[in-house]
């Protein structure tokens, strides 16, 4: 297979399409039911033929897997379930041979409770240098029986766990993920060495998990709703960390993308200053409902908040933490909110898929970079996981009220007629999460043979985006359009029209149709919930 044409600019990341791989669910090379690096290596040609520019891997490091690998025990070792460090290096090399860059995940807010540092801290006792790398504190109350403060966990419950000697340690997520103390020089030094470790092995970039949570109020004061500053979100000191990281990345020509959930546009933009992160995820677009006015406002706001720091926007519809797009868009309320996930809400998958196809063309036409989550190119819906098969700690921490995120993490279907749809080969074990019985229709081989499939749409759209200089980084100009319709031009006369109205609309005159997300009406009009790319 010929290597894809490289992206057009030196700053490739400004307009790249980056594919997210959740290794545990991507492809199983040894047939044990869990995805691994052998499976990734075998399926890299799929990503090259899809037309993406880079591949982001969620954590593949040694981990007890309490939180899907986001509880890292050793950044310099690959978890045995996935393979070896040698295999990871081969993934990086073989991806490069196919024209694909590799981005790895770093989780700097916390480590696993099985990390050598935390085990040392538990053994060392109160007041020890080993405990200073974390947030150990005596409790409140007459006998220290109460947590040191009232901070709520990201996964429900308290952020504090007591150890046998009476002290408590902080964990914004699960008790198995103790938070690091970023005012400690060992913590900063270790992460800088980890960055160099992976940059030396050829990775092109790093995605930073929970990027706004690292630094904490040194006095660990109680949380008050609306307090400014927040005691552990977006403290000013965090920017010193990212300035030091940027200097390291610049030595290698590598890039950063931050997971930054912030409602304040000005505070968000600070992370994207020229000496900090290159890009950050745009979650407002992901959470936006399928409504024309809301989408246009979100697009405008996103471009405006990036403009002062000259950073490219990123566009994402789905990831390993949120309800899949085809399901969300098939509901009456099409927005996404972690506090209101609408579990069990019926979804019209035919409608949701039609909208997801249109959303794909909208997203790929916007200026900046795009992230695709594995299975988006197949139109996978959210899966219902039986209660006895749920593995996400979010479910257990919520007392069972939150089904968790497993429904968007179900293993990929590759071959319609194979056991487990080819996830683990012909003799593979049962996958770690159950696949729905009707997923043969979503399999890669079946969609590859169908010119009208979601996969065919993505391959065509990505090929056009790569070949057309007007797409990617650049400008966007809105066009006059009927109510319920989004229409804008990019450079070189490229036009995108998305019909979110209740009826068909006329396409602009004197334009050539390049691609549509669905068939046009017999009269040549654009149906509802359909998008088109045209050239003047």
Predicted regions and their residues:
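Active-site and adjacent substrate-binding regions of carbohydrate-active enzymes
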Residues: 2-510, 520-536
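Local beta-strand/beta-hairpin segments that build beta-sheet-rich folds
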Residues: 512-516
């Amino acid at each position: 297979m010929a290597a894809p044409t490289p992206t057009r600019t030196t700053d490739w990341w400004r307009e790249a399409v980056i594919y997210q791989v959740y290794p545990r669910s991507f492809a199983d090379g040894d047939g044990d039911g869990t995805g691994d690096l052998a499976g990734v290596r075998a399926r890299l040609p799929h990503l090259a033929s899809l037309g993406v520019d880079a591949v982001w891997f969620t954590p593949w490091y040694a981990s007890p897997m309490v939180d899907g690998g986001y509880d890292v025990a050793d950044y310099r070792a690959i978890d045995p379930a996935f393979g070896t460090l040698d295999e990871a290096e081969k993934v990086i090399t073989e991806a490069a041979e196919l024209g694909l860059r590799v981005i790895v995940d770093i989780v700097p807010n916390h480590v696993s409770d099985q990390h050598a540092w935390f085990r040392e801290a538990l053994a060392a006792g109160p007041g020890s240098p080993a405990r200073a790398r974390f947030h150990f504190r005596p409790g409140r109350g007459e006998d220290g029986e109460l947590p040191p403060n009232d901070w709520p966990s990201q996964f429900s419950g308290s952020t504090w766990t007591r150890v046998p000697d009476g002290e408590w340690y902080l964990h914004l997520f699960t008790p198995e993920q103790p938070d690091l103390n970023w005012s400690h020089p060992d913590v900063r030094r270790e992460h800088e060495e980890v960055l160099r470790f992976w940059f030396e092995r050829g990775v092109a970039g790093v995605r930073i998990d929970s990027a706004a949570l690292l630094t904490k109020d040194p006095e660990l004061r109680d949380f008050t709703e609306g307090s400014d500053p927040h005691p552990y979100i977006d403290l000013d000191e965090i920017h010193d960390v990212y300035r030091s990281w940027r200097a390291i990345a610049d030595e290698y020509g590598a890039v950063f993308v931050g997971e930054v959930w912030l409602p304040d546009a000005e505070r968000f933009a600070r992370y994207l200053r020229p000496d900090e992160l290159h890009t950050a995820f745009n979650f407002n677009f992901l959470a936006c409902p399928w409504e024309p006015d809301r989408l246009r406002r979100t697009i405008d706001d996103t471009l405006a908040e990036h403009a002062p720091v000259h950073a490219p926007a990123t566009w994402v519809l789905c990831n390993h933490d949120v309800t899949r797009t085809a399901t969300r868009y098939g509901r009456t309320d099409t927005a996404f909110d972690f506090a209101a996930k609408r579990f069990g809400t019926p979804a019209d998958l035919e409608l949701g898929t039609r909208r997801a196809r249109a959303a794909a063309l909208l997203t790929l036409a916007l200026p900046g970079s795009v992230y695709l989550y594995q299975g988006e190119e197949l139109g996978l819906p959210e899966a219902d996981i039986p209660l006895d098969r749920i593995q996400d700690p979010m479910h257990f921490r919520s007392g069972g009220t939150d089904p968790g995120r497993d429904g968007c993490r179900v293993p990929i279907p590759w071959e319609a007629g194979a056991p487990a749809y080819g996830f683990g080969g012909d003799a593979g074990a049962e996958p770690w999460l159950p696949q729905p019985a009707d997923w043969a229709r979503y399999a890669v081989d079946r969609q590859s043979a169908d010119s009208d499939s979601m996969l065919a749409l993505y391959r065509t759209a990505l090929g056009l985006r790569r070949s057309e200089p007007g797409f990617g980084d650049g400008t966007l100009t809105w066009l006059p359009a009927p109510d319920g319709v989004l229409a804008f031009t990019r450079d070189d006369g490229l036009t995108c029209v998305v019909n979110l109205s209740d009826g068909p609309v006329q396409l602009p005159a004197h334009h050539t149709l390049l691609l549509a997300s669905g068939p046009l009406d017999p009269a040549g009009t654009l149906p509802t919930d359909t998008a088109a790319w045209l050239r003047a």
